[in-house]
């Protein structure tokens, strides 16, 4: 993988002081929350050396590298925030709205309001009066979005590992709630746990 840099942010820093990357983790799983993170790096920041030179879209990184990157991101960022929306809310308002809610909560939780939001994906509904840009594949293109993707993913993985201790039969520490063959078979044998999303139907189990 080619190392990422703050090229996109440099262009924007001419006009915006605090450029905030936002991404989520957990839209697709059958269980657990959706988690979003917001990250603002200092103006003119560049990852010249160290572990942040290895930053990329969290899906392209190993779990161990994500765990190394997360504290470095928190240390180098001007400010950051992580917010989760639980499975019950997902079932009540749907996963798209829950994802928007998590992203907005992350942006609102920052100790200093950003001047521009960079959102991974192609849609966003803001709750705060801040301009934004949506960027398809932004977690592989924009440094601050990639950083947000790592914080969101590592926090969600941590939460699912805690759930695995309460519901060990589902293997959440391995599948993070995603619909792996092992996970679907566990649902077939044991039924859904209290943290499963009831609005997500399983064709493998004949659900429609």
UniProtKB/Swiss-Prot annotation:
Requisite cofactors: Mn(2+); Mg(2+)
Disulfide bond residue pairs: none
PANTHER family referenced in this protein's UniProt entry, alphabetically: RIBONUCLEASE H2 SUBUNIT A, RIBONUCLEASE HII
Cofactor: binding comment: Manganese or magnesium. Binds 1 divalent metal ion per monomer in the absence of substrate. May bind a second metal ion after substrate binding.
This protein's name: Ribonuclease HII
Principal place of residence: cytoplasm
Binding, a divalent metal cation: 23-24, 120
EC identifiers of the protein: 3.1.26.4
HAMAP family, per the entry: RNase_HII_B
Organism expressing this protein natively: Chlorobium luteolum (strain DSM 273 / BCRC 81028 / 2530)
Record keywords: Cytoplasm, Endonuclease, Hydrolase, Manganese, Metal-binding, Nuclease
Catalytic activity from the UniProt record: Endonucleolytic cleavage to 5'-phosphomonoester
GO-annotated cellular components: cytoplasm; ribonuclease H2 complex
Domain RNase H type-2 residues, every copy: 17-208
GO molecular function: manganese ion binding; RNA binding; RNA-DNA hybrid ribonuclease activity
Family: Belongs to the RNase HII family.
Compartments it resides in: Cytoplasm
Entries under Pfam families matching the protein: RNase_HII
UniProt KW Cell membrane keyword: no
Role: Endonuclease that specifically degrades the RNA of RNA-DNA hybrids.
One GO process term, biological-process aspect: DNA replication, removal of RNA primer
Family matches, as PROSITE patterns: RNASE_H_2 (PS51975)
Entries under NCBIfam families matching the protein: PRK00015.1-3
Taxonomy, superkingdom: Bacteria
